[in-house]
């Protein structure tokens, strides 16, 4: 992480303290997504999907980042079966259909994308379901996948959602062309 770019530094630059945060959502537990957990410990709730937690704790040895969160793990939630996403499972964060944590297995078994709705528009935060918009245009799944078939299914869903005229923005965690921005919709 470049100087000034850690989550703690970015929040401080905006005058936001960890205790001001109601939620911190961990899409998955890869080191690059969980390394800043100590900088947001004051948040009211830190959340990760139970399925992601299970696979990272008990099965997948690639998760060398466990030491960052095992002493005080994030709170876990269960996906619910519904009609949303490639796996037809999501977690309705507020119970009002405004924010769904959509199960997009493939890169990891329990990863989610955040689907944020406002009226008839939405923003999709894809985590590592796609590297950039080029990924869904070319059909290129992430380089590291637990399950390439499920990753392709997730990528196809991301592409479909991203091309929808109701999509205000579709953002990927590792897109080199992404820039800090405010999205109003």
Predicted segments with their positions:
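Active-site flanking residues adjacent to catalytic metal/cofactor-binding acidic residues
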Residues: 27, 48-49, 106, 125-128, ...
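Catalytic metal-binding/acid-base residues of hydrolase active sites
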Residues: 30, 52, 105, 109, ...
């Amino acid at each position: 992480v470049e100087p000034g770019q850690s989550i703690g530094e970015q929040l401080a630059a905006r005058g936001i303290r960890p205790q001001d945060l109601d939620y911190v959502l961990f899409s998955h537990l890869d080191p690059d997504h969980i390394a800043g957990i100590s900088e947001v410990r004051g948040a009211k709730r830190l959340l990760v999907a139970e399925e992601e937690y299970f696979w990272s704790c008990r099965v997948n040895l690639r998760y060398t980042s466990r030491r960052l969160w095992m002493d005080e793990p994030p709170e876990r939630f269960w996906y619910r079966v519904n009609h949303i996403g490639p796996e037809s499972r999501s977690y309705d964060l507020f119970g009002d259909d405004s924010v769904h944590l959509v199960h997009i297995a493939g890169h990891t078994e329990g990863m989610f994308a955040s689907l944020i709705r406002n009226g008839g528009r939405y923003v999709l935060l894809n985590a590592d379901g796609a590297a950039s918009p080029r990924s869904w245009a070319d059909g290129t799944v992430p380089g590291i996948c637990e399950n390439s078939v499920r990753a392709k299914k997730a990528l196809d869903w991301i592409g479909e959602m991203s091309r929808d005229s109701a999509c205000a923005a579709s953002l990927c965690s590792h897109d080199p062309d992404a820039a800090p921005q405010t999205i109003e919709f």
